[in-house]
């Protein structure tokens, strides 16, 4: 701090997307209750995901969707997400809404999720009530259901990036780690509850008779859980709005020269001025005038500059994205086909047999048991997430990352080699280890990278090189993009492998092989901050 006759230091607290010559200020400590409230978004999201996993195939079959359109349903959403995630991530970095940068996007995507569920779970019933012509009814039912599935998948995949960026914006480094563990914990709880409710035969219960069909029952529960969870999430931690440092000079933003409050939201773009009665107020204004063009150029991000920021991201970010892609490719390869694997390989059923045949009924039984296996996965994911907090102090993030990939690779390998009912259900717990790992460790590493960069920025002279337009939203979105890319790879390539091999056992073998390759990658190429 300078004396009373010198210029006042002007501290600008900005995200990684902007020049931050004096570093960033640590956020205040958040209570466990606030972090749990923040994590409810993951509970609601995963609950709805589980309902979709249990019901989307029966819904698509019931409306008569042609097999030729199946691939379009499953590929359209991840393709859209892969293309748009970084754009929206960058837009949220520069959002100037009064109630924050991330929450407007989270609210919009939650509404889109609700609309998507309403369309794919109720579309057929609505069309049946409004359209009499059988041909038009078929066309409208298929169209509305497809739109609903794509809209829900797109929104549910998309929303993870803004939720993580919101957590990173409002929490200290220690609270980020705790928050990510709570996210994984409630992700498991939400998935388990969704799978359990999806396994109940609602048709023969009073609620099923009251609402009409099991599809309407599940929409009722899904809408209720989603609305309550996201209201809780959006009210969890106050988010400071982005101030316009390019149009509001420091003297206007804080005419009294007061520092930011402790509760305060050391927000992106805000100004702190040191209390000093003899400070020269002309100096900060002059500095603001000199920096104004730079600030404007930083906030204006074209598609070209965004792509350049992603292409030129540091190598350790790229390696983390590749490892995330490998992990999700292995995980989705197994999860998307697991119930079919249980029905065909473990139970030796026939999905193409007559619906009243013994082989088909055996297949259905295998699918039901497979759903319970996925429930075991969700429960164990929550349990493992709880113990992760203790384990990280002993084996570090590298050990957690490596162990998650290794256990999943070994577990799926044993399932493929020895397809027994009981051993398969026990080994479903390894899916939970991988799920928890994918939801926590990569984002913990992103938080570590951000903290390291902020420390380096604090040691640089003013006017040093910036991060080429990259912000926390862009980094989280780039990581989340890998989930969509993995879906594209799995949806486009795994069916081809199954057709070539003539058996779905190739699915779990592929998942095992990819995961073990990922073990080597996370050990050799991913950078870990000491």
Curated annotation (Swiss-Prot):
Superkingdom classification of source: Eukaryota
Cytoplasmic side: 1-45, 90-105, 160-184, 238-318, 388-398, 447-477, 526-530
GO molecular function list: D-glucose:proton symporter activity; sucrose:proton symporter activity
pH dependence: Optimum pH is 5.7.
Keyword terms: Albinism, Disease variant, Glycoprotein, Melanin biosynthesis, Membrane, Sensory transduction, Symport, Transmembrane, Transmembrane helix, Transport, Vision
Entry-listed glycosylation sites: 356
Gene3D superfamilies: MFS general substrate transporter like domains
GO BP, sorted A to Z: developmental pigmentation; lysosomal lumen pH elevation; melanin biosynthetic process from tyrosine; sucrose transport; visual perception
Transmembrane domains' residue ranges: 46-66, 69-89, 106-126, 139-159, 185-205, 217-237, 319-339, 367-387, 399-419, 426-446, 478-498, 505-525
Membrane-related topology note: Multi-pass membrane protein
Knockout or disruption consequences: Mutant mice have clear white fur with red and transparent eyes without melanin in the retinal pigment epithelium chorioid.
Region (Disordered): 275-299
Tissue expression pattern: Mainly expressed in eyeballs and skin melanocytes. Also detected in kidney, colon, gall bladder and pancreas.
Record's subcellular location: Melanosome membrane
Entry function: Proton-associated glucose and sucrose transporter. May be able to transport also fructose. Expressed at a late melanosome maturation stage where functions as a proton/glucose exporter which increase lumenal pH by decreasing glycolysis. Regulates melanogenesis by maintaining melanosome neutralization that is initially initiated by transient OCA2 and required for a proper function of the tyrosinase TYR.
Family: Belongs to the glycoside-pentoside-hexuronide (GPH) cation symporter transporter (TC 2.A.2) family.
Subunit structure: Interacts with TYRP1.
PANTHER family, alphabetized: MEMBRANE-ASSOCIATED TRANSPORTER PROTEIN (PTHR19432:SF34), SUGAR TRANSPORTER (PTHR19432)
Protein's recorded name: Membrane-associated transporter protein
